[in-house]
């Protein structure tokens, strides 16, 4: 309804599109996942960009409200839900028909957007409430944006050698967990921000700089969504995180007969041979 009836700040939308045209569309990736007959035309992709920018504004307005909507005569919509966290369920009722939520989720989970540097929102992919709670814990404890990603694969040293002919070294020598398949991951997780020692890191919003913002955007490619999964299209974020960042993975599970159980795993991001990364990245879906 908000989309169809234009219930969003049209001035902000114009500002957001100008920002997206400058920082995101130039990094649109090649449409290599879709068969030629499934690829959208340039005009259709441009329309998708416009749609997902509006989606982002509307999702934020639903969470926290927007006084501009009151000026437009939409008193109830202007209030929002005073949400500390939210989620978006797309598959398949939405994504079979409309562009997916990856861009909106990635950007809202990030510490900046077209309005500048700000606190990251907490928005769970596929309305995964348990993961949303874990993301909220992480955000409130650290002040940082939270990385939502699939634990797709554990790659043992032997498996990496078998499929690539190369060996993992350094901190990766005992094997790696490949976090992939989430085009909704916060751009802060690129690791393009650096601390005072020059080490890659994820910063709380009050430590972010304009240089950090531009570096995170530059490191992110927006690939057209795989239309075998997302018939409605959209764009998904893709990047390779810098190695050397300490990270904590969290997951809240509901165990029958026990209740909520929080899993924690501490580790590090690692740099690996680019040729190894290319092979592993293409084993599932880079988008």
Regions found by a protein language model. Name each.
Residues 10-43, 49-287:
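Anaerobic metallocofactor- and corrinoid-dependent redox/one-carbon enzyme cores
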Residues 1-12:
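Terminal amphipathic helices with adjacent charged low-complexity linkers/tails
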């Amino acid at each position: 309804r908000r989309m169809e009836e234009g219930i969003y700040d049209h001035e902000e939308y114009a500002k957001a599109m100008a920002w997206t045209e400058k920082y995101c569309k130039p990094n649109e990736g090649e449409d290599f996942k879709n068969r030629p007959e499934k690829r959208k035309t340039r005009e259709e992709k441009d329309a998708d960009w416009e749609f997902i920018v509006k989606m982002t504004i509307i999702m934020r307005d639903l969470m926290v409200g927007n006084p501009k909507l009151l000026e437009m005569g939409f008193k109830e919509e202007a209030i929002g839900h005073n949400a500390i966290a939210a989620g978006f369920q797309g598959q398949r009722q939405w994504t079979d028909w409309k562009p997916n939520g990856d861009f909106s989720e990635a950007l809202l989970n990030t510490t900046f957007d077209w309005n500048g540097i700000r606190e990251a929102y907490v928005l769970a992919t596929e309305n995964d409430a348990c993961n949303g709670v874990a993301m909220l814990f992480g955000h409130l404890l650290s002040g940082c944006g939270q990385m939502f990603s699939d634990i797709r694969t554990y790659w043992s040293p032997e498996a990496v050698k078998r499929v690539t002919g190369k060996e993992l070294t350094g901190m990766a020598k005992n094997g790696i967990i490949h976090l992939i398949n989430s085009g909704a991951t916060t751009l802060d997780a690129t690791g393009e921000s650096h601390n005072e020692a020059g080490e890659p890191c994820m910063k709380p919003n009050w430590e972010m700089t304009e240089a950090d913002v531009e570096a995170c955007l530059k490191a992110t490619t927006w690939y057209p969504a795989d239309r075998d999964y997302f018939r409605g299209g959209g764009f998904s974020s893709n990047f390779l995180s810098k190695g050397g960042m300490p990270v904590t993975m969290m997951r809240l599970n509901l165990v029958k007969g026990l209740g909520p159980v929080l899993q924690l795993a501490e580790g590090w991001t690692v740099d690996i041979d680019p040729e190894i990364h290319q092979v592993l990245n293409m084993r599932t879906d880079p988008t």
